[in-house]
Amino acid sequence: MTNGADALCDTLLANDIDVCFANPGTSEMHFVAALDRKPAMRCILGLFEGVVTGAADGYARMAEKPAATLLHTGPGLANGLANMHLSLIHI
């Protein structure tokens, strides 16, 4: 039976998003488990949200396709917002 985390991974893969930069916490374990079940999805661990969002931005610029990010809600998202804002600037 497909759960929401598997459906999200399937949706990402169906849209050619096959890399996820992640700084997961305990509340995201269902999605982390789903990433592990999808061999086509590459998950890259980052130890700080700024690294995760910066790496996703750099990947998208070099590969010319988006990457997914997995951050904690609240403070994790706040730590990544600066890079998310900068990713909107085309260099």
What are these model-derived regions, one by one?
Residues 89-91:
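Conserved small/polar residues in nucleotide/adenosyl-binding loops
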Residues 1-76, 82:
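Thiamine diphosphate
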